[in-house]
Amino acid sequence: MPTPAHLSKDPRYFDFRAARRVPETHAWPGLHDHPVVDGSGAGGGPDAVPVVDMRDPCAAEAVALAAQDWGAFLLEGHGVPLELLARVEAAIAGMFALPASEKMRAVRRPGDSCGYGSPPISSFFSKCMWSEGYTFSPANLRSDLRKLWPKAGHDYRHFCAVMEEFHREMRALADKLLELFLVALGLTGEQVAAVESEQKIAETMTATMHLNWYPKCPDPKRALGLIAHTDSGFFTFVLQSLVPGLQLFRHGPDRWVTVPAVPGAMVVNVGDLFQILTNGRFHSVYHRAVVNRDSDRISLGYFLGPPAHVKVAPLREALAGTPAAYRAVTWPEYMGVRKKAFTTGASALKMVAISTDNDAANHTDDLISS
């Protein structure tokens, strides 16, 4: 097991608690190139983050508007017990409060997708982010977490039980939201059933969970919790603590909109592969996480996407007489494209677009300075 002395020299570990300043390794330029506005809707303006209530008979229409205009929305009435969400947040806080030497037992190795460490996309950037993360697959939850708790004691069993309960609730919710998305595209109940019977999207969707801890920062104007990006999969549920920090990018004029921390609500982000599946009618959203001087922040991303071998292409029901804007790709193929995009500054969605002149392919995938 790594000792504290060894950790101080390990480039994979940074002691945020001991930091009295933001070192150059964690200082990001260009963070304030665009203004930041409040997304709570207090003034009733155009920057109010859309809210979808799944109990509302008109929820599909609300999803359609939000997915077309924002690529994200706050989800209420989802049915996941609030006391479970509180237990999930407490479990995450407890995990990140473990001694560094214990967390480093589960450090993510090069090429691995699961484990403890910096955000997975951090390898594409020269600067470090002001956060710690832990990624695991719900399908392999207990084996993944044995790296953190090799003795499988009480803390391990409690954490696994909470996350397994959360996964069951979220997987059921994902199926309901997928159906709502398809209805929002204009599909009838029969068409939704036919799509599922033919393509088995809901049946085969895979899930990944990524836990985030954003420590309070001595100089938040120079640091960034998570770099601006889009999610690669179908869609993501984000559970965040009552400390705001998630921001969505909006055009016309360019600005960052801070998502309000609403008790009991989740954030839903549309991903790149869902933009492809819907032929650009629903679009993915650039988002980032910022830090603050006074409070730690916790979030959990529950990512949904297709199995690795499945080709994702625009649904014919989404074409509505228009040509397909994107070629078919598997998730691993698309991740390879994203890797090239990160290193060249290009747009991954444009790289898989059939025609770069197609409005759907170019809706929101221009890169931004952040």
Swiss-Prot record:
Its cofactor is L-ascorbate; Fe cation. It catalyses: gibberellin A20 + 2-oxoglutarate + O2 = gibberellin A1 + succinate + CO2. GO terms for molecular function: gibberellin 3-beta-dioxygenase activity; metal ion binding. Gene3D superfamilies: B-lactam Antibiotic, Isopenicillin N Synthase, Chain (2.60.120.330). Residues 205-306 form the Fe2OG dioxygenase domain. Disulfide bonds: none annotated. Its EC number is 1.14.11.15. Keywords: Dioxygenase, Iron, Metal-binding, Oxidoreductase. PROSITE patterns: FE2OG_OXY. The active site is at R297. Fe cation binds at H229, D231, H287. One of its GO terms (biological process) is gibberellin biosynthetic process. It holds the Pfam family 2OG-FeII_Oxy. It comes from the Eukaryota. Belongs to the iron/ascorbate-dependent oxidoreductase family. GA3OX subfamily. Converts the inactive gibberellin precursors GA9 and GA20 in the bioactives gibberellins GA4 and GA1. This is Gibberellin 3-beta-dioxygenase 2-2. It comes from Triticum aestivum. The lineage of its organism: Eukaryota, Viridiplantae, Streptophyta, Embryophyta, Tracheophyta. The gene is GA3ox2-2.
